[in-house]
Amino acid sequence: MSSLGETLFLQKVLRQESGVPSVENMNPAMIEGLARRDMRAVAKAYVDSVRYRLGPEPIFIEKLPFNFLYLGFIARAWPDARIVHLVRNPMDACFSMYKQVFTWAYKFSYSMDDLARYYVAYDRLRKHWQSLLGDRLIEVQYESLVTDQESETRRL
């Protein structure tokens, strides 16, 4: 298994493959453009862009927190993939972000009110994708992973 870390490759490829010139991560025109695309070609473009960072195994981790926004595209691009999603206690997740100084992203993390609203929206979207993807979306509780890593790893 290879770890790509936290990269922007997915957003870059989705933006390019949408056919819509934009500096935004995603907008309605881009979603419409991607809806008409063969997502396997999008998956190939993504893998081609990160190939130099991959190991020999076909399994890799891309851990950018914003990737939950793209679960629908990820599921279509890799129809056989299982997606591991780490879920943390809301208070702990929000406080962890609040006390961290980020250089370029997560501007909402500097206000507890904004963090709370963002987390609620994230949780609604997470539940939506869980209902559609079923067992393809494997949720791992952060706290369980920390306290019993071996059992959680075996479950995966």
Question: Where are the language model's segments positioned?
Answer:
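Glycine-rich phosphate-binding P-loop
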Residues: 1
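PAPS-dependent sulfotransferase catalytic domain
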Residues: 4, 8-35, 47, 51-155
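Catalytic cores of large soluble enzymes that bind and process phosphate-bearing ligands
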Residues: 38
